[in-house]
Regions:
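Conserved acetyl-CoA-binding loop-helix of GNAT-fold acetyltransferases
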Residues: 84, 90-103, 129
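A short beta-loop-alpha structural element at the N-terminal edge
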Residues: 1-17
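Conserved acetyl-CoA-binding loop of GNAT-fold acetyltransferases
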Residues: 127-137
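Conserved beta-strand-loop-alpha-helix junction that forms the acyl-donor binding cleft
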Residues: 114-125
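A conserved beta-turn-beta hairpin within the catalytic core of GNAT-like acetyltransferases
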Residues: 69-79, 89, 111, 135
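A short helix-loop-beta-strand connector motif used in the catalytic cores of GNAT acetyltransferases and
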Residues: 41-53
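Conserved GNAT-fold acetyl-CoA-binding loop/helix
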Residues: 9, 20-41
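Conserved beta-strand in the GNAT
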Residues: 53, 59-68, 76-78, 83
Length: 138
C-alpha cells in the first residue's frame, strides 16, 4: 500500500542517500551526500514548502519537493523536483505521486502548478501524460 509522509529531518538522510545513488548510478551525476543534503534541505526549509516522500510497503519509492507561491490573484505551486527511484519507474509510482501532490496542493487553494523539466523523451512522456502544457524551450 502506498503512503506519503512529510519530508523532515527524520527521513532526509535516507532521501539523500537514495538521491545520490539514483543520480550517480543512473544519470551519470557526480553528487556527494553533502551537496544533495544541501539541495534538498534548501527546498524543504523554504517558507511554504510542500515536500513529501512516497513509500510502498515501508520502502521509499520516491519523493517530491516544491513550494507555494502567492500572487495577487492566485496561489501557485512550483514543483522543484520529483524523483522516482529507478526500481520503481514505469510502474505507476510517478503518476500516483503526482496525483497525491495535485490533491494536496488543490486542498491548499492552488490554481496553478508549474515546473521545469529536462527536455528528453522520458520526461516529456511523463509530463505529457499529466496534461502539462509545454511553454518555453531553450
Amino acid at each position: 500500500m502506498r503512503e506519503y509522509k512529510k519530508l523532515t529531518e527524520e527521513n532526509i538522510d535516507e532521501v539523500v542517500h537514495k538521491y545520490v545513488d539514483y543520480y550517480n548510478n543512473h544519470d551519470n551525476g557526480c553528487w556527494t551526500c553533502e551537496k544533495a543534503y544541501k539541495r534538498i534541505h534548501q527546498v524543504m526549509t523554504i517558507e511554504d514548502a510542500e515536500c513529501f516522500v512516497q513509500y510502498d510497503g515501508g520502502e521509499m519509492c520516491g519523493f517530491v519537493m516544491g513550494y507555494y507561491k502567492e500572487f495577487d490573484d492566485l496561489k501557485a505551486y512550483f514543483l522543484e523536483e520529483i524523483v522516482i527511484f529507478s526500481e520503481y519507474q514505469n510502474k505507476g509510482y510517478g503518476a500516483t505521486l503526482m496525483e497525491e501532490l495535485e490533491a494536496v496542493v488543490r486542498r491548499n487553494g492552488v490554481e496553478h502548478l508549474e515546473l521545469i523539466s529536462v527536455n528528453d523523451a522520458h520526461h516529456m512522456h511523463f509530463t505529457r501524460n499529466r496534461d502539462f502544457l509545454r511553454q518555453g524551450i531553450w
